[in-house]
Amino acid sequence: MEKRERKKIRVLAGGVFDLLHVGHIHFLSQAKSLGDELVVIVAHDETVRMQKRREPVNPAEDRAELLRALKMVDEVYIGSPGTIDYELVRKINPDIVAIGPDQRFSCERLKEELRKHGINSEVIRIPYLYKEDRAKTSKIIQRIVETYCE
């Protein structure tokens, strides 16, 4: 009997990933555990300026290169300026979209928006690594400033 090849489950994760830290690693490893391939979309610098109201510490190209160096990450793209790049998401064709604990939209709302754009993916939220928010880029920047800039 011929062995049928199982379809690989493709997971998509997106984020800023500035000052890569343990919270990012936890998020990406949990996202990877949901499937076989992990594709990451890194936020465009203009998107960071709009959403975070600050300059990214590292440009998108550098953040993408760091992510490409991680064993758990299979592909990396830089998103378009602004909101979700549905054309890119459609091209990636994920089975699952993993969202981080700090991403503001709900799983159901994102699932609806994806469907409106012809993308039939499950949406799963990955929880925080720690109960407190110490593994956040903004908190790390705050600790650096408090410790080294006085």
Swiss-Prot record:
GO terms for molecular function: ATP binding; FMN adenylyltransferase activity. The keyword Hydrolase does not apply. ATP binds at residues 16-17, 21-24, 102. It is an enzyme of class 2 (transferase). InterPro entries: Archaeal_FAD_synthase, Cyt_trans-like, FAD_synth_RibL, Rossmann-like_a/b/a_fold. Pathway: Cofactor biosynthesis; FAD biosynthesis; FAD from FMN: step 1/1. It holds the Pfam family CTP_transf_like. Its EC number is 2.7.7.2. Keywords: ATP-binding, FAD, Flavoprotein, FMN, Nucleotide-binding, Nucleotidyltransferase, Transferase. One of its GO terms (biological process) is FMN metabolic process. It catalyses: FMN + ATP + H(+) = FAD + diphosphate. Its cofactor is a divalent metal cation. The keyword Nucleotide-binding applies. Homodimer. Belongs to the archaeal FAD synthase family. Catalyzes the transfer of the AMP portion of ATP to flavin mononucleotide (FMN) to produce flavin adenine dinucleotide (FAD) coenzyme. This is FAD synthase. The gene is ribL.
